[in-house]
Amino acid sequence: MNSKLLYRIGIVAMSAMLAVAVYLALVFYPILVESAEEDIDVVFRALFPFISIFIAPVAGLVLYLRKKPAGLTLCAGYAIFMTAASVFCIGLTEFNVANVLTVILYLASAVVYLLPQSRFSFAPDSSPVDNALNSLMWAVLLVFIVIGPVLLPARYIGMIVGLVLLLLVLRGFVGLKK
């Protein structure tokens, strides 16, 4: 597969995730708010994901279409958030499994197209700082994706997404200095 095809796959996958986000917002948000009544914790858990649903994918997709690195960072954070939120808040259904597969497809195509392969490998010629950042980034991502949705309250997911985004941005700056 060439990079142009991978870029197009990324656009299609991100657009599909935006459609999924809008669908989830239209279907589940009124149910969550109605069931919350006066419980502020439930209202917070309902509001935070849906705010990100309308801001992050639109901004990320626009940046991605303009081939800006910030688009990848924003979309990757959104994809991780949506995957975790789908599993944590709604549970595994056929619809959510399709959403997770779309997330994986998007991330794979975006990473292959926009980032040099050396940034995600442990090459002998890489500096110890590069290898340490690679290890830290993958460890945070794996812990967040696998353990985060099970152990953490929904309000902390945003903080972890922020940490992941920060790591990705820092990793990008280190890579640009080469």
Predicted features along the sequence, with ranges:
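Topology signature of small-to-medium multi-pass alpha-helical membrane proteins
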Residues: 1-178
